[in-house]
Design a protein with these regions (language model features):
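C-terminal beta-strand edge segments of enzyme domains
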Residues: 1-53
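C-terminal, non-catalytic macromolecule-binding modules
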Residues: 20-26, 216-238
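A conserved beta-strand->alpha-helix junction
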Residues: 15-22, 99-104, 108, 112-159, ...
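Phosphate/ATP-binding catalytic cores across multiple sugar-kinase/actin-like superfamilies
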Residues: 50-75, 169-173
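Active-site adenylate/phosphate-handling loop in enzymes that bind or generate adenylated species
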Residues: 95, 125, 148-226
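Conserved helix-loop functional segments at active or binding sites
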Residues: 63-72, 93, 97-100, 143-147, ...
Length: 238
């Protein structure tokens, strides 16, 4: 930045870089000796937009956290929604497609479209996607609890059971294979409590937990700027 507050040179962000800047003018004091500069102009890194910067920060943060914690691979629950889709893309960008496992866990309440969107996303990212139905586990839970739940209506309790079953499956995979579970909740959901304790909050790193839902959509559009990676149905899903 020059004395007028104008950016005159910029190094690349979120990766190692070397920037050489030439100083000119009577106000430059080189101290003892001569300040030698190469007149050849070194490249000028383009200014990044806010969405691009946030995306790159999330990729770098995920890569560093996974590596420094001693993990080599990560596992993500794919719901067919935009949060898990964006998280999966960030994970693949950070770790590589061979180091990310996607798991979709449909129940009797899951739509066919959600399952298909999860599988399509995994195919486009080139990652393995395991489909593990949870209907029988869910039925076993509700049968076990039928006595103490007798006479009470179906409510958020049963909905949370599904999330907690999925969380247990992901943690079991983590324990058995040594993968880090990446959770997919965004800041808007966490701010209002739209999440399930011991369910979709289970994991070692909440990748997008510091960005609001609006930014999640912006990042999805940025990811799809050249070609469709995240299915359009996922982005347009209410």
């Amino acid at each position: 930045i020059n004395k007028k507050g104008i950016v005159v040179d910029r190094a690349s962000g979120f990766k190692e870089d070397l920037l050489m800047v030439e100083f000119k003018g009577p106000d430059v004091n080189a101290g003892e000796g001569k300040l030698r500069t190469d007149k050849k102009r070194i490249r000028y890194a383009a200014s990044e937009g806010n969405v691009e910067s946030v995306y790159k920060a999330l990729v770098l943060g995920t890569r560093d956290y996974v590596k420094k914690c001693g993990f080599k691979k990560a596992v993500i629950g794919l719901s067919g929604g935009i949060d898990s889709a964006v998280t999966a893309v960030i994970a693949v960008k950070a770790l590589g497609r061979g180091k990310v496992l996607g798991v979709t866990m449909p129940s009797s309440f899951s739509s066919k479209g959600s399952i298909e969107d999860s599988v399509v996303l995994a195919e486009k990212l080139g990652i393995d996607c395991q489909v593990i139905p949870i209907k029988s586990i869910y039925n076993a839970y509700t049968k076990t609890l039928s006595g103490i739940f007798a006479g009470l209506p179906f409510d958020v309790t049963e909905e949370n059971l599904q999330a907690r079953i999925r969380g247990k499956i992901l943690m079991a995979i983590s324990n058995k294979h040594g993968y880090l579970v990446l959770t997919t909740g965004n800041k808007s959901e966490l701010a209002v409590g739209y999440c399930t304790l011991y369910g979709d909050m289970c994991g070692g790193l909440a990748v997008i937990s510091d960005i609001p839902k609006t930014m999640v959509y912006d990042i999805a559009e940025y990811i799809n700027r050249r070609k469709e990676i995240i299915p359009v149905d996922t982005i347009e899903k209410p």
